[in-house]
Each structure stands twice: as structure tokens, then as C-alpha cells.
């Protein structure tokens, strides 16, 4: 599920909305599975990390907890300030313009943020700061809402904005096509990133990461999370309130909670 344009790095003002409520973003956005963190640490030659687009530190803290030294690079000063308050060292800059000042690192990671980075310029920057055999790891949480919850979103949107058009996203294919569906999602998310990595000539062939996990949301947890996903940015305050109230009532009718099947997907590449 995504609200991103094909080349979001060319329209970065879209990302500025997220810093308006950094505390909500940090509280409500999903984290990442422990298996992902373990895999990335195992692939890295050491524990000196940079987290590109660290935001409030959601992607950084699991690596810190595992004993890594993590430096965040974040373009939004509001998000950076929140992350600092949670114990993360953060430098404020666009990653492409960030000045590493001669420092090198064992791994560069980016969780749900690389789409805001120019894929070629970003990969070149990474190549310049990684130590020999250093790791680049890009990852994101992909998910599809249960059909009843997706329908509730559509109904709530039509209730809040009766004159607007709500387009339902394409449905997940039948179970026997699940593997092909996963490949399509992977390709959509990371084909441009992989192209940028290859064009530098500085990395091994990118390899896929994929970890599946579930999370159950209560009504209140989901209503807290929805505004952090960007899909309501264009609604005024009254329309947003109508949307959330209608959606909350629908979730109550569905039993008050539901489970999302997440797939944390991404790519890794090794510095030659």
C-alpha cells in the first residue's frame, strides 16, 4: 500500500508534512522485524552505521539496541530533534548534500526513506562513505489492508469528500500467485534503487531482502497511524475529522481490531 509518486525524490516537499507531528509519527508508524536487523548486522563488516532519512529514529533504535553505533542523517529538523531526544546522534542535511568530513562507515541503512533520495546520487554518496566490504541495506514495510478495512477506507473517504474520486488499489491475486505478486511489489519499490547502485560500478549485484510478519491494530491504534501515511494531507481539518470518525465506526463494526500482514522488503549490496 503506497501513496508515493513514481519519482518522489523530485517532489520532496511531500515529505515535509511528516515532521508536523513527529511524536505521532514515532508512536504510530510500524517498526521492523528483529530478523531484518539480525540479517543486516550479520552482513556488515562492523557496527558503525549511518541511517539515511532516519526520521524520528524508528529504523535506528533497533540497531542501537543491538550494539551498533548509529549516526542519523535527516533532512527534516523537526524529526531530527525528536530523534535526538530519544538518544540518536543526527546531522540535518539532504543525504546527497551531506558532508561526511572524511568519516567512513561499516554500513549505510535506510528504512522507508530511500525513495526520497536520488537513486544514483545517493548510491554514489554511499560508495564514498563505506569502508571496504561495507554494506548498503535499503528496506521498507509493504502491506495490504484486509479487504473489509480497505472498503471501510473507501467509504470513509467518500463520506468525508463526497465530490472527490476514490480509486481502489489493485487487489492481491489468488494464493497461488502470491510469489509473483511479491516479486512485482519488490520490483516496483526497488528497481530504481538497484539501477542506481549498479550504475556506480562500486557494489556487488543487489540482493533481495524479505521478512514477513503480522501486527494487530486496535481501532485507536489504526486511527493514530492513518494520518502518518500521507493519504490525508490534502484534506482540511474538518474533512479529516469526518474521515477518521467514519473509519473508526466501521472498524468498531468489524470487531474493533484487525491484523495486517506485513512484508519488510528491500535490497542489500556490498561495497567492492
Tell where the protein language model's regions lie, with residue ranges.
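A short acidic, Gly/Pro-enriched loop at the edge of an enzyme's catalytic core
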Residues: 98-108
Amino acid at each position: 500500500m503506497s501513496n508515493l509518486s513514481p519519482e518522489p525524490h523530485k517532489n520532496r516537499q511531500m515529505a515535509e508534512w511528516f515532521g508536523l507531528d513527529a511524536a505521532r509519527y514515532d508512536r504510530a508508524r510500524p517498526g521492523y522485524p528483529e530478523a531484518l536487523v539480525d540479517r543486516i548486522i550479520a552482513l556488515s563488516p562492523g557496527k558503525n552505521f549511518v541511517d539515511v532519512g532516519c526520521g524520528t529514529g524508528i529504523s535506528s533504535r533497533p540497531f542501537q539496541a543491538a550494539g551498533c553505533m548509529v549516526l542519523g542523517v535527516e533532512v527534516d529538523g523537526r524529526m531530527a530533534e525528536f530523534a535526538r531526544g530519544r538518544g540518536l546522534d543526527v546531522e540535518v542535511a539532504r543525504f546527497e548534500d551531506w558532508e561526511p568530513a572524511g568519516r567512513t562507515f561499516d554500513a549505510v541503512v535506510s528504512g522507508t526513506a530511500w525513495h526520497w533520495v536520488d537513486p544514483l546520487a545517493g548510491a554514489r554518496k554511499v560508495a564514498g562513505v563505506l569502508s571496504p566490504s561495507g554494506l548498503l541495506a535499503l528496506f521498507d514495510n509493504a502491506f495490504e489492508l484486509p479487504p473489509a478495512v480497505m472498503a471501510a477506507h473507501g467509504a470513509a473517504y467518500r463520506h468525508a469528500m463526497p465530490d472527490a474520486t476514490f480509486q481502489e488499489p489493485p487487489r492481491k491475486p489468488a494464493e497461488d500467485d502470491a510469489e509473483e505478486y511479491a516479486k512485482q511489489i519488490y520490483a516496483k519499490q526497488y528497481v530504481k534503487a538497484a539501477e542506481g547502485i549498479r550504475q556506480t560500478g562500486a557494489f556487488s549485484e543487489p540482493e533481495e531482502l524479505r521478512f514477513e510478519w503480522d501486527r494487530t491494530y486496535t481501532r485507536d491504534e489504526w486511527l493514530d497511524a492513518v494520518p502518518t501515511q500521507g493519504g490525508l494531507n490534502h484534506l482540511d481539518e474538518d474533512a479529516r475529522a469526518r474521515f477518521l470518525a467514519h473509519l473508526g465506526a466501521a472498524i468498531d463494526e468489524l470487531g474493533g481490531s484487525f491484523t495486517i500482514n506485513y512484508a519488510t522488503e528491500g535490497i542489500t549490496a556490498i561495497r567492492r
